Amino acid sequence: MSSRKSLGIAVALFVVVSIVASACQAGTPTRAPATAVPTAVPTAVPTAAPTEIQAPTIPNCGTEPIVLNAYFETGFPVPKQLAEEFSRQFPNVKWDIKEDQFTNLINATPRLLSGDNPPDLIRLPTMVSFAKEGLLMNLDGYAAAFGWDQWPVPQLNQNRVAPDGTRGSGSLYGMGLNYSLTGVFYNKELAAQIGMTEPPKTLAEFDELLARAKAAGLLPIMMWGSAKSGMGLAFPLQHLMAAYGPVEPINDWIFQKPGATIDTPSNLKAAQHLQKWIENGYFPPDINAIEYTDANARFTQGEGVFMFNGDWQNGAYDAAMPGNIGFFLFPPAEAGAPPAAMSAPLTFGIAARAKHPDCAAFFFNWVATDPTARQINVTGFGSHPGGPADLPLPTVPPGSVTNETLAAGAVVGKAGTTMDFIANATSSIFAQGWTPELQKMVAGQQDAAGLLKAVQAEYERELVMER
């Protein structure tokens, strides 16, 4: 298998850079000196340099009562925990938090950003079209004011939008509350029952474990697939794509590089492999009706040997399955090839017409630099908190699965084999492409080749609309 290292992969993950730096350096969080930032509404993706900072005061929340209007994603408690801690430290700031499923946010975000009461903070499923339409605040001024430009470069790149609408460079339109990693979680007791003594090193070894689980009367893989939550089979599919081929073309497609396609020979092998898993009965028979939160509850209650998910579930898994939860990176198809993983920031943005953009930006900076906020991210979310490279990583409880996910982040970071999520390629590709087509595959109404062609057609349709 060819080497997967490239400059493009640097866009996908800064985790190992920060982990290594955090392990080797010590420091204490400080709020960088800065100046006030302009908050004028952008009308389009900028083609010039960021506006020069003018006044000599740091953006903050002031001392007068403020209510931050926020939209969070259902099933992810840590953003709310961060909001509660922020109000504890800054009592003048209260929150009006609304939550919704990821797929609902995809459909609702344009209306929310353009409405009469646009959010100060909103979980962003995608951002290109919103940035181009002037619905999102350009954060370049805040980046200069708070010193974000001094943080590891790849940390911000996934949230940059260039004038031509491609991601990975250009102006900053979002910030990650943390930085995630995906892979395979497993129930240690059930894994022992099927003879698993160590994580599989190849796809063939993983296939053998799935077959053993099925033969033993166990559910091999717990996943979700409802239209409300979005089809979780996109997770194993993307891991299979990276097992069969390089990650660079996958990232090119996600970042909307000219000529990029998801319909490639290696991705066809991946989709065919997923179809075989479906036909073998490796997933719940009712997967198309299972919501994300229900799938996690069933997994922690002992239904399913394996589950594809991200490190944001670490805290919940440790609490529900203490000492019985493990994690490994999805193995490659070819022995000796490096494993790969999806990794992306938990992206939030500020509406262009938000009432309190300075306070929202101050919150972004606080999440990345405050010791308590960073600890909440690592302990409660299991994800890397980001921020300056010289800040120490918060302590991780002994025996926590977070130790395993952080170690895995170092592996794929060094190998350069990280990807953004295929669900993030366009504003609606998850809701209008992957979810319905994968649901059809589960129902026997779509095959591997048809899946990729249908999603590529939807992708091209959306690119025309967004540009």
Feature locations, PLM:
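Extracytoplasmic/periplasmic solute-binding protein
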Residues: 54, 164-177, 182, 207-259, ...
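C-terminal capping/gating helix-and-loop segments adjacent to ligand/active sites or protein-protein/ligand interfaces
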Residues: 99, 253-256, 341, 403-460
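Extracytoplasmic/periplasmic substrate-binding proteins
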Residues: 81-83, 87, 128, 232, ...
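Extracytoplasmic "Venus flytrap"/periplasmic binding protein-like
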Residues: 85-158, 189-201, 298, 306, ...
